[in-house]
Amino acid sequence: MKNKDSLHVSRRRFLAQLGGLTVAGMLGPSLLTPRSARAADAVAPGAATKEGILTGSHWGAIRATVVDGRFVAAKPFEQDKYPSKMIAGLPDHVHNAARIRYPMVRVDWMRKGHQSDTSQRGDNRFVRVSWDEALDLFYQELERVQKTYGPSALLTASGWQSTGMFHNASGMLARAIALHGNSVSTGGDYSTGAAQVILPRVVGSMEVYEQQTSWPLVLQNSKTIVLWGSDMVKNQQANWWCPDHDVYQYYEQLKEKVASGAISVISIDPVVTSTHDYLGRDKVKHIAINPQTDVPLQLALAHTLYSEKLYDKNFLDNYCVGFDQFLPYLLGEKDGQPKDAAWAEKLCGIDADTIRALARQMAGDRTQIIAGWCVQRMQHGEQWSWMVVVLAAMLGQIGLPGGGFGFGWHYNGAGTPGRKGIILSGFSGSTTVPPVHDSTDYKGYSSTIPIARFMDAILEPGKIINWNGKSVKLPPLKMCVFAGTNPFHRHQQINRIIEGWRKLETVIAIDNQWTSTCRFADIVLPATTQFERNDLDQFGNHSNRGIIAMKQVVSPQFEARNDFDIFRDLCRRFNREAAFTEGLDEMGWLKRIWQEGSQQGKGRGIHLPTFEVFWNQQEYIEFDHPQMFVRHQAFREDPDLEPLGTPSGLIEIYSKTIADMQYDDCQGHPMWFEKIERSHGGPGSQRWPLHLQSVHPDFRLHSQLCESETLRQQYAVGGKEPVFINPQDASARGIRNGDIVRVFNARGQVLAGAVVSDRYAPGVARIHEGAWYDPDKGGDLNALCKYGNPNVLTLDTGTSQLAQATSAHTTLVEIEKYTGPMDNVTAFNGPAEMVAQCEYVPASQGNPHD
């Protein structure tokens, strides 16, 4: 009981001293200094400048320069010929005012524990504690929740985290928590939630994260490329593993082909994208579709292909099932409305003749459909994904070089020929060691829920929802643990999140920046960035170009610790340290990962040097023999020997499996469903006339690097996140370029800086996702976000009962020039640290139950 007693003594001493302090009295003199001015306190003077330190990141490999112990510059790795502009912000990722410096506990939670006033979450008042105390509190809460409620009350989540095969927060969080007890797991993700559920039903695989046809073959064989909601040039800057950016050489070649007229590119998008602009504003045919009406356009294209006998009947007969069940809907035999070009014109805002001409062009020669992810991130996003496949099937070019469809062209260097190399392993989230609390009694609740519906579980526990053919009873969550993720960035409708957060008893966040998730947490633990540790990573994703050493650039800042060390010490508190570490430290794990890769290589005729030679001398190795690849070629060449993973083994234009689910919002074949809200004459557009896009940003990866002042200086407008708006819409509202505006709807309000641009169609506005939430009244529902997080405005509803994915792009807003008080942006300043000197008795290093 020594550990437990120490914890109680510590809290009593804290409370005794806290009671006599005012807020002003709790602020120590040094803490009155702005955090930005105190950032240098973390840097110990060094003896020399270090240059050329090789490491990697989501934005590419770099050579780092360190002066006096401080990461001051990032230069592109010499093997990256197309480096991202975002690497300029990487030093800020380490040294900025929003770094989490110490373990912190929310003031009222420190007073009352899990019985705290949860409406105070977000008030940004925290107490600094020692690592021992923070981990004791973490462990105590895990124990309490498992003993009081069981596994149905605990949810853990991770996300994009940092690069590195070993230091992955998701695996470490999963292993540590699983060694203590079971918990609620999640399925799906926020990027491709609708597509990744529907496509396995239609073509037998997820498609969204898979390799695409090699670009050299596309450039050689395609005559028409249709970019449908895909912005490759912008989005390929950042990848899951360290990108090599080789794919940009093919964009250069595509630009040359477009300029010469050898390839025609058509962009179906409400916006002139970065890719469209790069290939040539006047060279790319722009079909500026009304938002959320892509399915009517697809149906009209299919109708034209069928009615004008431009479709490939042989392909439909031999490689597909269900076209005959789909056809009556397409022709209007079911509902009296043919889904022809004249019908679609009224919804899409695209001339019927243009629609018919597009269908003829696509059928006229080899056509590659390049589909992005943004379109499926709206209500009924499954239908658009399904129709992409149907159109490609009707064209009959699936499995041919430069033809067919693909959903991952903008991600992970897709289309770059893959090399014959090895893929390193990493730190697994599972072990064979049983947990301390081995209960699998979820008390009738589901043990797995769709990630995009986790707020429903918090707000409506016990509610039964459908999900991909299953019935899910949402569990009554009481505690959440987040590592390497930021739900306040990735989840929709922030005021609904805040409402749900008030129902949780304990929230723990492990991160390196004071994101909104951390500000709304009870216990915050400071993790290192990838630049403060050693690791290994792939160089190139689909290209599998090589392996790179991620060398430590600077020492861990302040009291930040590696996730590995955080969870190791947590596991020590319940006698699972050995199971967590497997007896290895950081370098021990890197050697094991390397040795496993070496064994893998031997089976492929690849010889790797010893780890010591690689780490100390080479730092980078490159694989040979790029392999050309055609997506779905094997299936086309022999559908009997190479069937798809569908029940029929063929492309399912009609799915009996889905039809048997009897969902009214996702039936047996693709259909057009009206949205809850839609611009350009759709539901809700009279009150909220502007469609809001919240697509991937150009200067960060989701919310990562929003803390970089270096990068914000390149895009922020008046210190706010920019909102892009069409000149007609701006003029009608008296808005000029550079004005601070209020963007609002019934769900919330944000401030943003206006950028007036004709790249955006009338009725369409954009705020990039990942902007940090900055409420003027922290923790209050309906606060004004002073910086411009679009998820204050987005709608939290499932795409359908099939995928239950995010519908972020089903969002309408209004915009007006802002004339109210202009408070300073404080999102990037870190917390208001409440200082009370309290003695803490260190926890026992042995078994806390001794």
UniProtKB/Swiss-Prot annotation:
The cofactor named in the record is: Mo-bis(molybdopterin guanine dinucleotide)
What does the record list as GO biological process? anaerobic respiration
What are its GO cellular component terms?
Answer: outer membrane-bounded periplasmic space
**InterPro entries this protein is in?**
Asp_de-COase-like_dom_sf, BisC, CT_DMSOR/BSOR/TMAOR, Molybdopterin_N, MoPterin_dinucl-bd_dom, Mopterin_OxRdtase, Mopterin_OxRdtase_prok_CS, Prok_Mopterin_Oxidored
Q: What class of enzyme is it?
A: oxidoreductase
Broad class of the protein's primary localization: periplasm
Residues bound to Mo-bis(molybdopterin guanine dinucleotide) are 191
UniProt EC number: 1.7.2.3
> What catalytic activity is recorded?
trimethylamine + 2 Fe(III)-[cytochrome c] + H2O = trimethylamine N-oxide + 2 Fe(II)-[cytochrome c] + 3 H(+)
Q: How is the cofactor bound?
A: Binds 1 molybdenum-bis(molybdopterin guanine dinucleotide) (Mo-bis-MGD) cofactor per subunit.
* Keywords per UniProt: Metal-binding, Molybdenum, Oxidoreductase, Periplasm, Signal
Q: How is it modified after translation?
A: Predicted to be exported by the Tat system. The position of the signal peptide cleavage has not been experimentally proven.
GO MF annotation, one: electron transfer activity
Q: Where is the signal peptide?
A: 1-39
Q: Where in the cell is it found?
A: Periplasm
State the family it belongs to.
Belongs to the prokaryotic molybdopterin-containing oxidoreductase family.
Q: What does this protein do?
A: Reduces trimethylamine-N-oxide (TMAO) into trimethylamine; an anaerobic reaction coupled to energy-yielding reactions.
Q: What is this protein called?
A: Trimethylamine-N-oxide reductase
Q: Which organism is it from?
A: Salmonella typhi
Please spell out the taxonomic lineage of the organism that makes this protein.
Answer: Bacteria, Pseudomonadati, Pseudomonadota, Gammaproteobacteria, Enterobacterales
- Gene behind this protein: torA
